[in-house]
Amino acid sequence: MIQQQTILKVSDNSGAKTVRCIKVLGGFKKKQASLGDIIVVSIQKLRKLKKISKVKKKEIYKALIIRTKIYLKKKNGFYVEFQENAVALMNKQGTPIGTRIIGPISKTLKKKKFQKFISISSGLV
């Protein structure tokens, strides 16, 4: 589960390396976010190629959670878990900032209507 002040890895080519969760969107009592939720983040570290970076340090963006360490039970009885908590950055309109997502993403994003993120990802689990 992702909550406020959690450090997350960025899995797209927007130029950011790590982000910190500021707010979990989705209601005033919602304290934790899971796979497929949207959160508000601030950029903590950038990748080494700063000239190509589409984002700046300490700026605020929205992000979609694409991988979590918490396991996810599928309908066929299998459990799926990832090794890291990862997000993909998006702009105010909800479109991805990067043009590629590195690593696999979960198929549950397909049910939550994030087709643009699925189309730029490398694989589904």
Predicted regions mapped to residue ranges:
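Ribosome-associated RNA-binding proteins
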Residues: 1-125
